[in-house]
C-alpha cells in the first residue's frame, strides 16, 4: 500500500460537488443530514417530502443549494414526477438517501402489561396501521431506489465509470480524467434504526419489523446492484432528537445508553460524511450503527 505524502481530512470527508437526494430531508434526522451535506459542499441537495411548507422552511433555514421537491414516497406517480424534475434539472445524482419513515402503532405499553387480556389488547392496537408503516419504512426503500437507478447510473458515467451491467468476471472500466484522486461510485444510503436490530420494543412492533426489513433490503440491494456499480449502505440511528422521540429524556444511565445521552448533530453528520466522502469510497454493504452503545446493553441481533 502506497503511503500518501499528504492527506487532507477536509477533502477526505467532503461532500463537495455531490448531487444528493434525501427523502424526509425537511425535518428530524433528515434535516440534520441536509444541513451537514450543504455545509460540506454538496452541489445540490434535493429534499423530498409530502409537506411542501416544511421542505420550503428547511431550504430557507439551511440555505445553500437545497431544493424542495414535494413527493409522497409511497405513491408511484408522485415519485415518478420527482424523478422527472430532477432528471430535467441536472440529469444525474451521486447519492440517494432513503430517510423518510413513520412510527406506526405504538406497542410500548406491552412491556408493562400485567394480564394476558391487557397484552392482547395492546398488541392489537391499530391493526390497520401496519400496512402504511411498512409502505413508508420498507416498500419505499425498494420503490425509491428503483426509481432513481437511472440517475445513479448517470452519476457513475459522469465520474468516468463504465455504465450499465458488467459481465461476470470482468472489472468495470473507467476513464479517470478529472477524477484521479476520487474513486467513489454512486451510492444508496438507507436510514434504518437500531429498532430493527434489537428485541426490546422501543417504538412499536410494526416500526421495529419494518426497519428490520429496510435493513435487510439494503443488504440485498448491495448484492443485486454490484454488477451495476451502485453501492448500498445502512445507517442505524439510536435515540436522536425527532418527532418520534419527543418527550423522552436527554440523559441516560450506562445500562440504557453507555454514552449517557441522545445522539446529536455532529454524531449523525460524522457517519454521513464518512460514507459520502472519499473516506467511504471502499465501503459497500456496510451497516453503521450510531447509537451511543445502546445495542451493546440491549438484547439484539446484528
Q: Language-model features: where?
A:
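Conserved glycine-rich Rossmann-like NAD(P)H-binding loop of the short-chain dehydrogenase/reductase
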Residues: 38-57
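A conserved structural motif in NAD(P)-dependent oxidoreductases
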Residues: 256-268
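Rossmann-fold cofactor-recognition segment
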Residues: 62-77
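Conserved glycine-rich cofactor-binding loop
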Residues: 19, 26-28
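Short, small/polar-rich loop/turn modules that mediate ligand/substrate recognition or access, typified
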Residues: 226-231, 283-285
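Short C-terminal tail/terminal secondary-structure segment
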Residues: 3-10, 273, 284-302
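Catalytic loop of short-chain dehydrogenase/reductase
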Residues: 102-103, 109-131, 149-227, 239
Amino acid at each position: 500500500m502506497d503511503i500518501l505524502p499528504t492527506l487532507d481530512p477536509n477533502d477526505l470527508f467532503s461532500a463537495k460537488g455531490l448531487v444528493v437526494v434525501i427523502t424526509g430531508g425537511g425535518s428530524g434526522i433528515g434535516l440534520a443530514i441536509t444541513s451537514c451535506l450543504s455545509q460540506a459542499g454538496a452541489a445540490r441537495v434535493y429534499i423530498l417530502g409530502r409537506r411542501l411548507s416544511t421542505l420550503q422552511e428547511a431550504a430557507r433555514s439551511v440555505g445553500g443549494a437545497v431544493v424542495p421537491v414535494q413527493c409522497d414516497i409511497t405513491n408511484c406517480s408522485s415519485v415518478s414526477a420527482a424523478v422527472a424534475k430532477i432528471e430535467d434539472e441536472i440529469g444525474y445524482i451521486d447519492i440517494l438517501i432513503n430517510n423518510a419513515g413513520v412510527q406506526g402503532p405504538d406497542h410500548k405499553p406491552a412491556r408493562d402489561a400485567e394480564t394476558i387480556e391487557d397484552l392482547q389488547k395492546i398488541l392489537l392496537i391499530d391493526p390497520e396501521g401496519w400496512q402504511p408503516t411498512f409502505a413508508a419504512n420498507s416498500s419505499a426503500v425498494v420503490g425509491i431506489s428503483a426509481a432513481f437507478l437511472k440517475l445513479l447510473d448517470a452519476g457513475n458515467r459522469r465520474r468516468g465509470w463504465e455504465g450499465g451491467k458488467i459481465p461476470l468476471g470482468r472489472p468495470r472500466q473507467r476513464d479517470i480524467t478529472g477524477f484521479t484522486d476520487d474513486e467513489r461510485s454512486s451510492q444508496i444510503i438507507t436510514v434504518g434504526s437500531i429498532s430493527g436490530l434489537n428485541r426490546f420494543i422501543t417504538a412499536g412492533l410494526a416500526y421495529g419489523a419494518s426497519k428490520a426489513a429496510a435493513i435487510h433490503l439494503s443488504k440485498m440491494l448491495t448484492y443485486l446492484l454490484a454488477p451495476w456499480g451502485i453501492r448500498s449502505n445502512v445507517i442505524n440511528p439510536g435515540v436522536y432528537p425527532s418527532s418520534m422521540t419527543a418527550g423522552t429524556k436527554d440523559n441516560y444511565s450506562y445500562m440504557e445508553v453507555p454514552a449517557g445521552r441522545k445522539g446529536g448533530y455532529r454524531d449523525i453528520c460524522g457517519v454521513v460524511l464518512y460514507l459520502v466522502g472519499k473516506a467511504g469510497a471502499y465501503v459497500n454493504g456496510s451497516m453503521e450503527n450510531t447509537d451511543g452503545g445502546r445495542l451493546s446493553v440491549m438484547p439484539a441481533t446484528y
